């Protein structure tokens, strides 16, 4: 095999020798040429699109299942437990999934799937408390950078918190954590907000 001269380098992906003029800062450190970098980026973009489509289809299948789980059920704790189990088992990016319920001036832990969690959260504290204060969904790509984040689990890296409303009043939250950064997007937001509306009668 030909050896690369001082003015050439070897791309680990395509196996071709490249001149120094082809280096980008990133490519130089990884020994990957610009052409291969571009192909990798295109493949990653395509993979993300496919993953988003699969996620949307999964949520689409889950909506009627959630409706079925709560229909005519008097055991509201059991119904919420089943909903959290259904969601948690349906997505690989769900590390923790459960509910926090408004009780006076705190949020109390409800049914969930995942590691042990905080029993109570005050308004304005952490992601859940901030979502309660703002009365809106919060999507946090990196919880380590979120001011006042409550680290119930050291594994959590990103989080989405969705309020459950009764009229204008927030009565509970769907809380989902992931071990990966930037795990949640607009699809998660839109679909979990739909689920929040479906389960709202359980809190009446």
Residue map of PLM features:
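Juxtadomain coupling helices with adjacent low-complexity linkers
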Residues: 67, 178-204
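Regulatory sensory and allosteric helical modules in signal-transduction proteins
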Residues: 94, 102-154
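Sensory-domain boundary capping and coupling elements
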Residues: 165-178
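A short, aliphatic-rich beta-strand micro-motif
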Residues: 158-165
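Short cysteine-rich clusters marking metal-coordination/redox-active sites
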Residues: 11-14, 33-36
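Cys/His-rich microdomains that often coordinate metals
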Residues: 18, 40
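Intrinsically disordered, low-complexity terminal regulatory regions
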Residues: 53-111, 198-203
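Short linker/helix segments within small regulatory modules
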Residues: 21-31
């Amino acid at each position: 095999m030909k050896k690369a001269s001082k003015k050439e380098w070897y791309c680990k992906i395509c196996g071709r020798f490249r001149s120094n003029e082809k280096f980008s800062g990133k490519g130089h450190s990884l020994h990957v040429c610009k052409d291969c970098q571009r192909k990798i980026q295109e493949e990653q973009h395509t993979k993300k699109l496919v993953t988003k489509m699969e996620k949307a289809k999964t949520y689409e299948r889950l909506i009627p299942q959630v409706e079925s789980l709560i229909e005519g059920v008097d055991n509201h704790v059991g119904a919420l437990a089943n909903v959290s189990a259904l969601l948690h088992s349906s997505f690989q990016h769900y590390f923790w999934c459960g509910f926090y319920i408004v009780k006076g001036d705190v949020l109390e832990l409800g049914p969930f799937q995942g590691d042990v969690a905080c029993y109570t959260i005050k308004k304005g504290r952490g992601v859940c408390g901030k979502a309660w204060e703002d009365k809106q969904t919060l999507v946090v790509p990196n919880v380590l950078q979120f001011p006042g984040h409550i680290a119930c689990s050291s594994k959590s890296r990103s989080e989405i918190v969705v309020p459950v409303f009764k009229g204008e009043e927030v009565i509970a939250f769907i809380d989902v954590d992931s071990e990966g950064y930037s795990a949640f997007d607009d699809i998660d937001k839109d679909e979990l907000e739909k689920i929040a509306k479906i389960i709202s009668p359980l809190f009446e």
